[in-house]
């Protein structure tokens, strides 16, 4: 089983329906707040079930949800097919999109599932698809020194505030015996220092890489903003 197989099937990464709903609502609110303008074209890469994507769609001109798992794409189309400015695509379809067509690319809680030799071509694709001056946000990046205990503590705090604390306790126990735990042991999760991810993003051709507030409930994970070089203005004759 690969990470794509895991997300393509039934899993228990969320401890309850309420956990899932609150998680996706928080992420959607954070993405919507980052949208640069009402007419912006936004790509959400590795969006998962994106239960509150309508909040993002209402904040921008065009929202493109990219998801590698085909079963998740089917759910997204069934849920959001009525929204004229929202489309659902595969990673392969992103590669076929016109260059210089996006204002914002968001990859939240994604790059930990990519090896470095997978992340590098992804960065190149995102750079090509962004308009000059467009923004890339990498969120929920895991630093090498982040303890699983810290992640668990942040989840329990989110659960306490969100009203699913008992379910979260049970979910943490189930995770020990889950496919997620086995896959994490087999494949690991990619971690990056701030210096390391900055170097990778700059090497891909982005400029102005800076730390920003993370998306979601866990402030111990990192987020970064970077931009495609703006086209220089032609000199006035």
Predicted segments with their positions:
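Helix-capping/helix-break motifs at membrane-protein junctions
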Residues: 115-116
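Short catalytic micro-motifs in class I SAM-dependent methyltransferases
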Residues: 109-110
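Structural signature of beta-strand start/N-cap positions in the alpha/beta core
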Residues: 41, 62, 101-103
């Amino acid at each position: 089983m690969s990470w794509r197989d895991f997300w393509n099937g039934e899993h228990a990464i969320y401890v309850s329906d309420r956990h899932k709903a609150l998680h996706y609502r928080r992420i959607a609110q954070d993405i919507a707040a980052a949208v640069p303008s009402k007419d912006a074209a936004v790509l959400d890469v590795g969006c998962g079930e994106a239960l509150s994507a309508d909040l993002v769609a209402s904040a921008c001109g065009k929202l493109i949800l990219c998801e590698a798992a085909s079963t998740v794409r089917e759910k997204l189309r069934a849920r959001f097919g009525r929204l004229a400015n929202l489309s659902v695509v595969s990673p392969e379809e992103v590669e076929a999109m016109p260059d210089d067509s996006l204002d914002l690319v968001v990859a939240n809680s994604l790059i930990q599932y990519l090896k470095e030799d997978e992340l590098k071509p992804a960065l190149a694709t995102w750079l090509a698809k962004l308009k000059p001056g467009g923004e890339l946000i990498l969120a929920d990046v895991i630093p090498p020194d982040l303890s699983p205990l810290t992640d668990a503590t942040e989840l329990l705090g989110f659960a306490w505030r969100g009203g699913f604390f008992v379910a979260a306790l049970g979910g943490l126990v189930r995770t020990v015996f889950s496919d997620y735990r086995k896959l994490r042991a087999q494949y690991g999760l990619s971690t990056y220092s701030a210096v390391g991810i900055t170097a990778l993003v700059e090497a891909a051709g982005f400029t102005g890489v800076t730390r920003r507030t993370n998306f979601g409930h866990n402030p111990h994970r990192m987020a970064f903003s970077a931009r495609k070089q703006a086209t220089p203005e032609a000199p006035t004759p």
